[in-house]
């Protein structure tokens, strides 16, 4: 299924039903009083989060949504039926922005959570309500109000505990495949990963969610490559793993590659740049000898001071230990 993380849709809530003008007329009550019922309220439109949905693709092809109108009131004080509410099912982590103001107006972050997008129109009232001592046969009633209209943008930010960051072909997809059941495409060419992937990493009785996004290249902050569009999916991760290929097949410099990604991250968002990151040195199986020494030299060259991990995702070397360390870190954060 194609991954879609941003759509614009138009919403029209239901109109309230009109009130009714009616008078009681029965065989032995030829001049009964007013008995016009109220209309029904118009239906509203809600977002509803579903953990089993992972894309906004359904809203890419259908852009307009209408809730049901309320029914008009009837005689004998019968109220009109309220219009049914409409629920738009979206992935957990979906935010809503008003197109007119470009301001965020809401979000759904938990399974089953709802958020009202537009409110249905208020019902009209029947002539029964207008009876008084001076007006025993009122013909006054009110019309139902129009439902609210709004144009909104839905944005999906994936909810992951750990997010993977790095250049194309750094081995991020191989890593997420090696520690979870996720199956992103893996190949020896740039941008194998075209869309984000989520994988559940199980460590004993615990588990956490890992996200793989398309690789970041130089100029991503200005729109180059695929990384810019998907960098936003890192914002809600509890920590980020910067995956570096220690032995690139194109013979590029791992040090320069590391700083290229860090530079683009800082240009894109200072908030994202300040997020907690761990360094993962990948493809150590391609180093002929002195693996620990070469990794340590790399860490010193980039001036990295935090925790780092050396792995071979393809050979599953060090990946279980990495998963355990990440799980320990996440458990301490709760």
Swiss-Prot record:
Residues 1-159 form the Obg domain. Mg(2+) binds at residues 173, 193. Its main location: cytoplasm. GTP binds at residues 166-173, 191-195, 212-215, 282-285, 312-314. The keyword Magnesium applies. GO terms for molecular function: GTP binding; GTPase activity; magnesium ion binding. Keywords: Cytoplasm, GTP-binding, Hydrolase, Magnesium, Metal-binding, Nucleotide-binding. It holds the Pfam family MMR_HSR1. Its EC number is 3.6.5.-. It comes from the Bacteria. Its cofactor is Mg(2+). It is found in: Cytoplasm. An essential GTPase which binds GTP, GDP and possibly (p)ppGpp with moderate affinity, with high nucleotide exchange rates and a fairly low GTP hydrolysis rate. Plays a role in control of the cell cycle, stress response, ribosome biogenesis and in those bacteria that undergo differentiation, in morphogenesis control. Belongs to the TRAFAC class OBG-HflX-like GTPase superfamily. OBG GTPase family. This is GTPase Obg. The lineage of its organism: Bacteria, Pseudomonadati, Pseudomonadota, Gammaproteobacteria, Thiotrichales.
